[in-house]
Amino acid sequence: MKITKTITYFERPGPENTADCAALAVERATELGLTTIVVASSGGATARAFAQAVSGTGIRLVVVTHAVGFSAPGVWEFDADLAEELRSCGHAVICGTHALSGLERALSRSLRVGGGSRTEAVAEAFRRTIAVGLKVAVECVLIAADQGAVGVTDEVIAVGGTEEGADTVLVIRPSHTASFFDLQVREVVAMPRNR
């Protein structure tokens, strides 16, 4: 058996692709009978766009934000009022340590310890050879699985972007970070051609 699907390629990465990504994510979730879209959103704009796109579809969002302290010590960048609004609609808003950096980044930045890490090498390989959005989408699924917001047996739609907005849509079978090599990127629905 084979499946033939169209992949959407954006000319360049960036937030101008967010609306298209939201529509494509909902469309592919509906086609596959999936009920969860995992989406990265640092401040809330992308989460808001996706919440509008899934309204009335029965699809649940798992919004994964930057960890507290990512931009500055003790600061959560996400719009707290929007988080409450999304939760009241049945969506999840979670934050967790970046699965593909976290403690490793502290070690590689240290002048005493120094050097790159294997985990950061995996992240950089995703960013450089495929797409930043793919790295983000994979990482968000790992975080969501580790937080218990998604299971590891059912596929999800995963959405990431480059700096702001969304530009990559994937179908992923999740795993926990500790079982990283069990994660499967099963489909690329959309991604930028140029990085």
Whereabouts are the PLM-identified features?
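Long, charge-dense
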Residues: 3-7, 59-119
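N-terminal active-site beta-alpha-beta segment that forms phosphate/nucleotide-binding
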Residues: 27-79
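Internal active-site segments that recognize and position negatively charged phosphoryl groups
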Residues: 36, 126-160
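Glycine-rich, aromatic-bearing surface loops/beta-hairpins
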Residues: 123, 154-195
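Glycine-rich phosphate-binding "P-loop"
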Residues: 1-27
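Short coil/turn connectors at secondary-structure junctions
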Residues: 32-35, 56-60, 88-91, 150-155, ...
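General beta-strand structural signal in soluble alpha/beta enzymes
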Residues: 18, 38-41, 63, 93-97, ...
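Glycine-rich phosphate/diphosphate-binding loops and the adjacent beta-loop-alpha structural elements
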Residues: 9, 118-132
